[in-house]
């Protein structure tokens, strides 16, 4: 008589990328738990349902609230999130159990297929003045306006496939996406340019937590924590908690122009770069810190300290203006800036 398998319930968004990410998580967990059956519960969140409003206008928790309701009702045991979609302060009773090893956290340029096939444009610097760049991220638009003031930025919503189709068929010359999603879905060949903090990379810092997956559990659920613990990547968790501390201190949600870049130097030195850019790209406050970091608490203290320094140097003024715009409604539509 075969041993009855225990069932562990996983919550996720129902996009193709979210389901692919859950598949990767299950494939990594299964060898550690051969007698566990992982059952996936996929649902649409507010961000999935509303494909017309700009992301900033939808507020915080647009990718997570419905899933967390399932978690707290004990309908699922843990949720697989893109860490960058999670608010920096979780609802009471929720906890990040583990963070997985980070995929490449950078942003990338995907050119219109016609331009790529002709070899006409290979980077943002090649694009003519007035070229249209698709992005729904104020962080991406603000940073790129700083370096490429002649480009026009226009909202583009939808999943990866939808956005690439819009890029190819509509009036966009290129779109900006996270590398991690393209790599996980096997669309590597669409990447025309990698963006990072270097001059060649367009001076672009990525989103807080970008490229990492986080598993949210109920506070105190040690049983589920033990199940998912094999996937915890300590260096990624420490680095991303430093990034999240920056955003939490500056009171920025995922729809504000805060960019970060973390890198381990040697065995235990963490380098953290942060930029806060005005929506028109004309003002910015930048900072960086390098410290020996061995714990999450040290990482969070490092992020908080750097954020407080940036706030004193003008970052808070920039973010206050952004938040006033959100409160008044409509000021954060990408193409209107």
Curated annotation (Swiss-Prot):
Query: Where does the secretion signal sit in this chain?
Result: none
- State which pathway it belongs to: Porphyrin-containing compound metabolism; protoporphyrin-IX biosynthesis; coproporphyrinogen-III from 5-aminolevulinate: step 2/4
Modification type S-(dipyrrolylmethanemethyl)cysteine: residues:
254
Q: Which reaction does it catalyse?
A: 4 porphobilinogen + H2O = hydroxymethylbilane + 4 NH4(+)
Q: Which Gene3D superfamilies match?
A: Periplasmic binding protein-like II (3.40.190.10), Porphobilinogen deaminase, C-terminal domain (3.30.160.40)
Q: What does the cofactor section's free text say about binding?
A: Binds 1 dipyrromethane group covalently.
Q: What GO molecular-function term can you cite, just one?
A: hydroxymethylbilane synthase activity
Q: Which Pfam families match?
A: Porphobil_deam (PF01379), Porphobil_deamC (PF03900)
Keyword Transferase applies? yes
User: Known EC number(s)?
Assistant: 2.5.1.61
Listed under GO biological process in this entry are:
heme biosynthetic process; protoporphyrinogen IX biosynthetic process
Q: Is Transferase there in the keyword field?
A: yes
- What cellular component GO annotations does this protein have? cytoplasm
Annotated transmembrane regions = none
Q: Which SUPFAM superfamilies match?
A: Periplasmic binding protein-like II, Porphobilinogen deaminase (hydroxymethylbilane synthase), C-terminal domain
Per its Swiss-Prot or TrEMBL entry, what cofactor is needed? dipyrromethane
Give the domain of life: Eukaryota
Alphabetically list the UniProt keywords: Heme biosynthesis, Porphyrin biosynthesis, Transferase
Its family remark reads:
Belongs to the HMBS family.
Looking up PANTHER family in the UniProt record yields: PORPHOBILINOGEN DEAMINASE (PTHR11557:SF0)
The record makes one more remark, namely: The porphobilinogen subunits are added to the dipyrromethan group.
What's its job?
Tetrapolymerization of the monopyrrole PBG into the hydroxymethylbilane pre-uroporphyrinogen in several discrete steps.
Q: What is this protein called?
A: Porphobilinogen deaminase
Gene source species: Neurospora crassa (strain ATCC 24698 / 74-OR23-1A / CBS 708.71 / DSM 1257 / FGSC 987)
Q: Which gene encodes it?
A: pda-1
